[in-house]
Amino acid sequence: SVVDKTKVDDLRTDTTGNITVDSISDNKTNLGLVNAFTDVSLAAANISVTDVVTLAQANTIHAYNTAAGTTVTLSSVSDAFSNVETLQGTAGVVMTGATITTTTAEAVTKANVTDLNNFTTAKVTVTSVQDSRSNVSDIAAINNAEVDMSAAAVTITDAVTLAQANTDVGNLNSLTTGKVTLNKVEDGRANVTTLAAIDNDDVDMSAAAVTITDAVTLAQ
């Protein structure tokens, strides 16, 4: 049967002999405490982790069970995309039902999000996105129960207009409550001026390459 640290503690009071665990489910802290017991072996145990872990933490736990065929099943993962990707490819680690959060340490693209959504049947939350306007819109269109970017910091890599970046519903700033950063802007002078006047906490074009599409005078 599946045990947790509380049950292991009970077993240790019942016997002075060594205890071999076949299956354990608990949070990462308790799993570490159980593994540290000199009279308890997790080497042949299938391990389920009940709280969120990073790649480094999952690797630590995966070192507890060294027997062939044993698994570490994760319920929640939070790390940079490349670390999540590495974890997904780690033999003996199961994350097909884990919630996944990619951190701001690494912005994700539409292609990355597609991979993440294929890693798990549970919800994927992305906190930083960087891609073309079309691809960012595609990510936002995915049901939030599958992929949620509603609070992500977003960087748009191709040129956008005022209409595309406006705060009105249906445009870029409506896709997230996070900051939208524009790398390129291309529009008429008046529209670019209006766009630049939007609060930088909402839409920031302060470092954008700007192309003015209509005629301007020296005075303008």
What are these regions (language model features)?
Residues 1-220:
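General marker for long, soluble alpha-helical cores
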